[in-house]
Amino acid sequence: MSDAKKLTGAGLRGQSAGETALSTVGVSGSGLTYRGYDVKDLAENATFEEVAYLILYGELPTTAQLAAYKTKLKGMRGLPQALKEVLERIPADAHPMDVMRTGCSMLGNLEAEHSFSEQSQIADRLLAAFPSIICYWYRFSHDGVRIDTETDDDQIGAHFLHLLHGKAPSALHTKVMDVSLILYAEHEFNASTFTARVCASTLSDMHSCVTGAIGSLRGPLHGGANEAAMELIQDMKDEADARDVLMGKLERKEKIMGFGHAIYRDSDPRNAIIKEWSEKLAADYGDDRLYRVSVACEALMWEQKKLFCNADFFHASAYHFMGIPTKLFTPIFVCSRVTGWTAHVMEQRSNNRIIRPSADYVGVSPRKVIPIANR
């Protein structure tokens, strides 16, 4: 690595890899802000469309700007016939993140970014189209139905649920999906976002950057924690069973997903927000078992390991109460985080230098080639 500055720590933990004006994560041990606004404030007082506008365009919209933005996004929900045909060829047992990756890449073939002047338009298009992509594939491959991907729903969260279930969602479900999308919208230099920025630093197109980010999120160490949490809690009978199951896993030193975080030291601010909504959903659902066992898991993990729930853990029960199949949990993350990814791509482009770090060589010493007859 010669004169390059030495970066230490597994996975470059604690290292600064650049500057961003989009978000802060864990500055006080537990905080999360988007362009200066606390995520709790946004979740309580804004919609996801307002937050998307904030992240992509820099400020919260006025009433007129929000109305125009919602109208724009609603007009971008439809999918090209060629993309639908590709989605119909993807089997039902495919990994849904592969569907998202393929859908994004195919859209890039059909609606290519010819100039960076189109970047905001493409960011909005991806934000509007991603729920349509995953739901069109799911409904066709699992139900044999070719759905109309354009609905009159005012919000993206409601639109997703409408496409998935074939009917308009309740006010409660609409609100919870809206909050969920806000909580997942942006999170600084995580693995998928940094992947998008590295790709952007080569001056690649927006679809390639986002496709790369999806590929990064597909890995189980980054995405999928809410799916793993659902697999953990779904068969727990009650609080006592939850404690027994978790204690067994701890004794066997098994990794338990949905707890702790790479950046937050004290708590994940998103957890308390979605936990509250999960409790409300449980009451509405009429069976609070999954919520109760989740609370028991949370208490035990803190008691035994001093590990707090991250954003993913109570999302599992919340999504379940809204009738969302477990395999679609991570694609919902994509439908939200595409906001942050595309904003980071644009930020990288605005003050760009190709990201090309050095590496410490740990291989063999210099040597000579031995003729093949003598090896």
Swiss-Prot record:
Active-site residues per Swiss-Prot or TrEMBL entry: 222, 261, 312
Q: Which GO terms describe its molecular function?
A: 2-methylcitrate synthase activity; citrate (Si)-synthase activity; citrate synthase activity
Q: Which Gene3D superfamilies match?
A: Citrate Synthase, domain 1 (1.10.580.10), Cytochrome P450-Terp, domain 2 (1.10.230.10)
Q: Name the PROSITE patterns on file.
A: CITRATE_SYNTHASE
Q: Which UniProt keywords apply?
A: Transferase, Tricarboxylic acid cycle
List, in alphabetical order, the GO biological process terms annotated in this UniProt record.
carbohydrate metabolic process; propionate metabolic process, methylcitrate cycle; tricarboxylic acid cycle
Instruction: Give the protein family.
Output: Belongs to the citrate synthase family.
Q: How is the subunit organization of this protein annotated in UniProt?
A: Homodimer.
Q: What is this protein called?
A: 2-methylcitrate synthase
Q: What species does this protein belong to?
A: Shewanella oneidensis (strain ATCC 700550 / JCM 31522 / CIP 106686 / LMG 19005 / NCIMB 14063 / MR-1)
Gene name linked to the record: prpC
